[in-house]
Each structure stands twice: as structure tokens, then as C-alpha cells.
A protein has these predicted regions:
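Short coil/turn segments at alpha/beta junctions that flank glycine-rich nucleotide-binding fingerprints
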Residues: 142, 159-163
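Conserved acetyl-CoA-binding loop-helix of GNAT-fold acetyltransferases
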Residues: 141-154, 178-182
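C-terminal "cap" of GNAT-fold acetyltransferases
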Residues: 162-177, 181-217
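Active-site acidic-Proline motif in GNAT/NAT acetyltransferases
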Residues: 136-138, 142, 171-172
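Acetyl-CoA-dependent GNAT
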Residues: 9-15, 20-138, 149-150, 155-159, ...
């Protein structure tokens, strides 16, 4: 990976930086303040506030992991007993920190949920679920996204004892799809393009979700 970055567990002190990162990565218009100002003027729900509230709750779940004090290295998660106890909660938020200036430039979340794919496998097994992979635009194309995903693979396999992971991505997110395919993920199911409405009509889904799974971590 090009550049000096440290992977570690997120902590409550990272709340504002992670909120900025999430908004910049997923909704750049809000990062520029344009839509945020419009929402405030119209008294609509504030996107940034919703992101911040969600992160605050999830970082609270990570407090025990942060207190364990282990950092995530390039070779895998620390296997201290304290960190293993934290992983029993089966949720972690990893951040990538620039070693030069301390800025947070990447994040990813990993939890455990019933895996809906492949659809013929029922009951659906509980498997690690990767979500909210984000890298600041200034830190992209350096392999950081791949390193965050690989860190989740190592943690899921060596700390939690799983051999599979799953996620979903929007069909039009070509960059993310390319990354996941390069790491061995396979598309198991895609949302239908057309949805039936209760009134009997149909609605087109312009950017359907694609559910991906990786076997043999």
C-alpha cells in the first residue's frame, strides 16, 4: 500500500472526524454545505446529524474494544485476550489513520447478521457483514480500501472464527464492485429492477443493490 497508514479500532474521540469522512465519501454535496444549508432552511431532517447520531451509537459499542488497546496491524488484528472478549460482541469499526498528520482517511464497519445469500440456503446463517467502507478522495487509489477489507477478512477469520463474509453494493458503484470482485467476492443476487406497488402499479429501481459473498476467507 502506498503511504504510511495505521489501522486501528474506532473510538468515541473519532466521532467528528468519522462524521466528516462519511459525509465526504458518501454525500459530497453535503460536505460542500450546499444541500445541508437547504435542508436547514426547509426544516428537513439533517443528513449530517443523522450520520453523527448513528456513529455515536455504534462507537459506543466499540468502547470495550478501544479500552483493550490493541491496534490492527497489516498482518491482522491483535489477539490479546481483552480484544478477544470485545470481539464477542461481533461488531467492530476500523479506521485508517495517516501516520504523517494523524488524520482519519478511511473507515469500515463489520458486524454479524443473517446472510440472505445464496437464497436456497435456509435457515440463513449468521455471517460477518461488511458495511460503510469509505476512503477520503485525497487518499484513494493507494490500496487503502483493499487493506481495510482485508483487515476485516483477518478479523472475521482469526478472531471470530468465520470462513465467509457478505455485503451489498449499489450496481452503479463500479469502483466498489471492481474492488470486491478483485478480492474474490461473487454476486449471489441482485434486487429486481421493477418493484410492484401496493396499488398494483410498478416502480423502477434505477440503482439496485447487488449482494456479494466471499467464501474461504
Amino acid at each position: 500500500m502506498d503511504g504510511a497508514f495505521m489501522l486501528r479500532q474506532g473510538a468515541p474521540k473519532d466521532l467528528q472526524a468519522l462524521t466528516d469522512l462519511s459525509v465526504e465519501a458518501f454525500q459530497p454535496s453535503f460536505a460542500e454545505g450546499v444541500l445541508d444549508t437547504l435542508q436547514t432552511a426547509l426544516n428537513l431532517p439533517n443528513y449530517r446529524s443523522n450520520v453523527e447520531d448513528g456513529l455515536r451509537k455504534r462507537l459506543g459499542v466499540c468502547v470495550s474494544l478501544q479500552e483493550a488497546g490493541g491496534e490492527i496491524s497489516q498482518r491482522g488484528a491483535s489477539s490479546t485476550e481483552g480484544q478477544r472478549r470485545g470481539c464477542e460482541g461481533q461488531y467492530v469499526l476500523l479506521v485508517a489513520q495517516d501516520c504523517r498528520d494523524g488524520a482519519l482517511v478511511g473507515m469500515v464497519e463489520l458486524g454479524v447478521l443473517p446472510c440472505p445469500i445464496p437464497m436456497e440456503r435456509r435457515p440463513a446463517p449468521d455471517l460477518p457483514y461488511l458495511v460503510n467502507l469509505a476512503v477520503r478522495p485525497c487518499a484513494r487509489r493507494r490500496g487503502l480500501g483493499a487493506e481495510l477489507v482485508k483487515a476485516c477478512h483477518r478479523l472475521a477469520k482469526h478472531e471470530w472464527g468465520f470462513t465467509e463474509m457478505f455485503l451489498y453494493v449499489q450496481k452503479q458503484n463500479i469502483a466498489a464492485l471492481s474492488l470486491y470482485y478483485s478480492l474474490g467476492y461473487v454476486c449471489e443476487w441482485q434486487e429486481p429492477v421493477w418493484y410492484k406497488l401496493k396499488n398494483g402499479g410498478q416502480r423502477m429501481q434505477r440503482n439496485p443493490k447487488m449482494f456479494l459473498r466471499k467464501d474461504q476467507l
